[in-house]
Amino acid sequence: MSQHKIVKLPNWVLPEDENYLNEIGKDGWELIHIYNQHAYMKSTAAGTISSGSLNAAVDAFGRQRVSEPFTLGDYKHIFGIEDQLFINKVNGDGDITNNINHSSTGLSATSSGSYAIHQSKMYHHYMPGKSQVILASFVLGAAVSGSTKRIGYFDDHNGIFLEQDTTGSLQFVIRSATSGTGSITEQRVKQSNWNVNTLSNGEFTLDITKTQLFYIDFQWLAVGRVRCGFVHKGITVICHVFDHTNVLSVPYMQNPNLPVRCEIRNSVNTIIPSSMEQICSTVMSEGGYTESGKAYSVTNETFRVLTSGSSLPVLAIRLKNIVNGMPNRAFVRIQNSSVFTDQQSVRYLLTKLPSGSMLTTGSAWLSVDNDTSVVEYNTSATAYSDGKVLLSGFVGANSLNINQANPLVQSQPGVTNKQNFIAQNYDSTDSEVYVLIAKNMTANNTNVGGSMLWSEIY
């Protein structure tokens, strides 16, 4: 017998109509919740609801879902794969392509050892005490022997995802680097062992060759609950609950700040190409959210000479590769910047470079604030290339006091701006860079300097 059923309610039935609801709940069925005039029922043969763990009408902390969720990240592929938002990593004949008609990204691989990984640059900030929700739409496609497909909220060290393994078996997985030995451990639960709904029969029988909407919500606090399932006909169907308090002796996951990701990995040469599609995804915080980062700033200690008609990277910041022996998975947002010039008018650009290699530096990068920051800075760069201009404008020379710096303080794009952040690359070896550039628009030299104020979020 199916572990769940959905009953269409007559229009005259109200949620508080206990007599009617008790009647349809007889004979081994328990009401979980009502949504859009449908009663979502669970078989009592599979166990009873405990502390709301099966009730999708409450969040991961058991709070009634009445608040508007705060979107931490949202990802679509309507106009292609945006390199400002995604990291693509391939090996062998692994391939990643955009399907403009499907508004999706396709991954494929054929040969042994090949892989294709499509991952957000953003490691989304988890706020303790808030329920975090991830939704991802996809088509895994038919299983291909020797190929593993994954989609969810994860990286190489930690995360939660749906997996189709080399034999075609489906499972929910929690990956963790909490052992402290450098090894990765994984809780893996096959579909036949999902403890709420296996989706193996009944009205909603999971067909992974069709479009699906994967659902995750979790408490972290290092010891909380994780729920996995799917959204079907507007109803969130919880399939498996991982409980960790009073069970594990260590945190279930080392880092809750993670990217959305999908991947294909081949362990053998496959007879046919293995493929999947990733369509759309979002990460949300429930019950309120404040991006409570740590604020730092740097400035040029001395003026730099900007010659006539030239451009100069006045000041730059980037993320360190390693923090306390771990990959640096913080992200940084500029809050404001200032540019000053003493003699001539200049144009300024706040630019985001995709790699440190795009900046020619005259000396080593320096750690900010005696290593309490996850950022390092440079004030001696001489050239730059490529980059995305986030902000631009002009600074006029001070006509009253020529030798007095004339600052222009400019507010920066806010939290909702998808491009106003820098992050590390896939393996935390080459950070994106914020660089403040001055361009001399006149026929005479001038002295320039700059400052940056930013937030570090992790």
Regions found by a protein language model. Give the residues of each.
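Terminus-proximal functional modules
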Residues: 1-51
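Beta-rich globular "head" domains
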Residues: 28-30, 126-140, 287-440, 449-457
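Edge beta-strands of jelly-roll/beta-sandwich modules across compartments, strongly enriched
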Residues: 41, 272-279, 444-455
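Low-complexity, Ser/Thr/Pro/Gly-rich disordered linker/stalk regions
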Residues: 49-174, 190-192, 244-324, 396, ...
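C-terminal interaction-tip segments
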Residues: 145-166, 234-237, 430-432, 438-458
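Short, aromatic/His-centered strand-loop micro-motif at the edge of beta-sheets
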Residues: 180-213
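Short, solvent-exposed beta-strand-to-loop segments that form ligand-recognition rims
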Residues: 202, 232-255
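Localized edge beta-strand/strand-to-loop motifs within extracellular or lumenal beta-rich domains
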Residues: 209-225, 231-233
